[in-house]
Curated annotation (Swiss-Prot):
NCBIfam families to which the protein is assigned, alphabetical: PRK00596.1, rpsJ_bact
Annotated source species: Maridesulfovibrio salexigens (strain ATCC 14822 / DSM 2638 / NCIMB 8403 / VKM B-1763)
HAMAP family: Ribosomal_uS10
Family the UniProt entry places it in: Belongs to the universal ribosomal protein uS10 family.
Known function: Involved in the binding of tRNA to the ribosomes.
Domain of life (superkingdom): Bacteria
GO cellular component terms, semicolon-separated: ribonucleoprotein complex; ribosome
Subunit annotation: Part of the 30S ribosomal subunit.
Keyword Ribosomal protein: yes
Protein name from the UniProt record: Small ribosomal subunit protein uS10
Signal peptide from the UniProt entry: none
Molecular function via GO: structural constituent of ribosome; tRNA binding
UniProt keyword annotations, A-Z: Ribonucleoprotein, Ribosomal protein
GO biological process: translation
């Protein structure tokens, strides 16, 4: 019979604000440690930066431009040898708004 839990759970988190992201990571780490699972990470992944340049006025002044950038911060967590209790606790966990979570079992 195949067990419901695998050898590890890989959690990838993304957010625009690194402070909210770090709060979410600490909540996940605390929850996993309370259930007795070992944790590898959090591993900071490279920040994705996308820059956009637009003209300030519509028809005149080509030299007058404005630049905007958007940063996406990422973290990676591995929960090693999770128990069923760990999986249930992570399922009930509520994370801050603005954090994208990808979970691979």
């Amino acid at each position: 019979m195949v067990s419901m839990t695998s050898d590890r759970i890989r959690i990838k988190l993304k957010a625009y604000d690194y402070r909210i992201l770090d709060k979410a990571v600490t909540e996940i780490v605390d929850t996993a440690r309370n259930t007795g699972a070992a944790i590898a990470g959090p591993i900071p992944l490279p920040t994705q930066i996308s820059r956009t340049t637009i003209q300030r006025s519509v028809h005149v002044d080509k030299k007058s431009r404005e630049q905007f950038e958007m940063r996406i911060h990422k973290r990676l967590l591995d929960i090693l040898e999770p128990t069923q209790q760990t999986v249930d606790a992570l399922g009930k966990l509520s994370l801050p708004a603005g954090v994208d979570v990808e979970i691979k079992l």
